[in-house]
């Protein structure tokens, strides 16, 4: 077989066509960055009994990320944000997110501002090294009143702005009730 321009073009076209129909996994690719963690709510009884021992066991199992499910009185599981971050760091754990419920009581409608309690919640999340503040629940009265829910959606957006000031994002942990049509024929997501 002699090399000719015609053979070169034909073979190049065949090679290009072969690459297009080849399975995508035959080429080397970077390893996927799967950030699998554990929501500490799933081990809440253990965290309540002994948070340090529980975190140590989770780290030994191989978890690298945790999501808190208990924050009260400016503490995560009884520890200040700085103390809790130090504990996590000691076990090689990170806490990119956590559940802290934004409730009606956290918004002062007269002042059009958050209460100090919610401001501290966001500040403490940043101190603990979080990237996301997740509200885990909606007040019952919001789940049955369409106008109240629409109005509170604005508060959610303002919480996003507050979190953004600390380099974080705000989110909501949904459930099945957000898809029901109990808000004057509307769902929460409408």
Give residue spans per PLM region.
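Active-site acidic/histidine proton-transfer and metal-coordination neighborhood
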Residues: 13-14, 20, 107-190
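Acidic (Asp/Glu)-rich catalytic clusters
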Residues: 31, 55-60, 77-97, 117-129, ...
């Amino acid at each position: 077989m002699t090399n000719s321009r015609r053979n070169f073009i034909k073979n190049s076209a065949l090679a290009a066509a072969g690459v297009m129909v080849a399975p995508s996994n035959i080429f080397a690719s970077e390893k996927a960055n799967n950030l699998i963690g554990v929501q500490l709510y799933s081990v809440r009884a253990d965290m309540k009994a002994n948070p340090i021992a529980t975190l140590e066991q989770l780290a030994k199992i191989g978890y690298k990320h945790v999501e808190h499910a208990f924050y009260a009185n400016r503490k995560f599981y009884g520890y200040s944000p700085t103390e809790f971050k130090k504990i996590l760091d000691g076990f090689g754990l990170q806490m990119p997110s956590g559940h802290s419920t934004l409730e009606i009581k956290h918004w002062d409608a007269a002042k059009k501002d958050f209460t100090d309690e919610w401001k501290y919640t966001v500040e403490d999340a940043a101190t603990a090294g979080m990237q996301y503040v997740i509200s885990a629940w909606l007040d019952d009265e919001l789940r049955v009143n369409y106008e109240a829910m629409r109005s509170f959606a604005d508060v959610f957006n303002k919480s996003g702005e507050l979190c953004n000031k600390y380099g974080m994002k705000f989110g909501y942990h949904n459930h099945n009730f957000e898809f029901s049509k109990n808000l004057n024929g509307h769902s929460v997501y409408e």
